[in-house]
Regions:
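Catalytic Walker B motif of ABC-type/P-loop ATPase nucleotide-binding domains
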Residues: 150-154
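ABC-family P-loop ATPase nucleotide-binding domains
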Residues: 80-137
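ABC transporter nucleotide-binding domain
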Residues: 166-182, 186-247
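The feature captures the beta-strand-to-loop junction immediately N-terminal to the Walker
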Residues: 35-37
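Conserved ABC transporter NBD signature motif
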Residues: 58-69, 73-74
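Short loop immediately C-terminal to the Walker-B catalytic DE motif
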Residues: 156-160
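Helix-to-loop junction immediately C-terminal to a conserved catalytic motif
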Residues: 50
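A short, flexible loop at the N-terminus of ABC-type nucleotide-binding domains that lies
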Residues: 1-4, 8-21, 28
Length: 279
């Protein structure tokens, strides 16, 4: 579905490249967590995928078509929700009327259901909303477009705890086998139970492109009290409960993935996983 081939991108000539000879392949039907430190290019990658930024070298292909060309048949299949955005001072119904023609598969039913799940009315004025409410409305519209590729940049920023729970429920309810959702975030605990594939970026390179299921077959994520033996740990760090650690998995008794612990481990030990990319 999505292929990035030998991509190099920098914002200005002479500046350090955000990506250099970067390649990635993704199939459809996953909720993907795009993780990394601030400044590693998570948002940049989403904009490159959407065709809103152009690489100096290499290609970003959606079903074999370069996204930077912005052909209508590609644009109607993808939607991006930026971290920060402005909505016009109009009603939601007018916003839908103006924008739905660009998305042939748009569904009013999905829009209304998502708004209900976010506890928002269907008939509302966009200018009267808080930033968190605007984010919920825009994500509801994004889901209603029924695009095959949905790009979300820091979607839980500005949401309170109940709203983050609503977000996870809304995304999971409207997933299909044909849809791919890429969520860029540094708030990993907000999406830990939602995603089924992990992309981790670190210093112009891809640390990992793997499913959470495969990761949990290979690795166990544990908390042990102070003083307990951790000689079997592949990686360990102090935690409030004692020690957070990763041990080798047996493929049978899987544990819940700890994305923050995994990221910290992989930045120090990139070979921690046997097959870190494109599983």
């Amino acid at each position: 579905m999505l292929d990035i081939k030998d991509l190099t991108f920098r914002y200005r000539a002479g500046r350090t490249a955000v990506f250099h000879n970067f390649s990635l392949h993704l199939e459809e039907g996953n909720i993907i967590g795009l993780l990394g430190k601030n400044g590693t290019g998570k948002s940049t990658l989403l904009y490159l995928i959407a065709g809103l930024l152009h690489p100096q070298q290499g290609k970003v292909l959606y079903k074999g078509i370069e996204t930077q060309i912005r052909r209508p048949e590609v644009q109607e299949e993808m939607f991006i929700v930026p971290e920060e955005f402005e909505l016009p001072n109009i009603s939601l119904s007018r916003f839908v009327e103006l924008n739905r023609p660009f998305y042939p598969k748009f569904s009013n039913d999905i829009l209304e259901q998502a708004l209900r799940d976010f506890e928002l009315p269907v008939d509302l004025q966009l200018e009267a909303l808080s930033m968190g409410q605007k984010k919920k409305v825009f994500m509801s519209f994004a889901l209603a477009t029924n695009t095959r590729l949905l790009l979300l940049d820091e979607p839980t920023n500005g949401l309170d705890i109940p709203s983050k729970t609503q977000f996870r429920r809304v995304i999971s309810q409207h997933m299909t086998d044909e849809r791919t959702v890429i969520i860029s975030t540094h708030q990993v605990h907000d999406v830990e139970t939602l995603i089924d594939r992990v992309l981790m970026l670190e210093g112009q390179r891809l640390l990992i492109n793997d499913t959470t299921a495969h990761i949990c077959e290979q690795l166990r994520f544990e908390q042990r009290p102070y003083g307990q033996d951790i000689s079997d740990a592949l990686y360990a760090e102090p935690s409030l409960a004692g020690t957070a650690l990763i041990t080798r998995g047996d493929g049978f008794q899987n544990t819940q993935i700890d994305l923050e612990l995994l990221f910290n481990a992989l930045t120090q030990h990139p070979d921690l996983l046997e097959t870190p990319q494109n599983v």
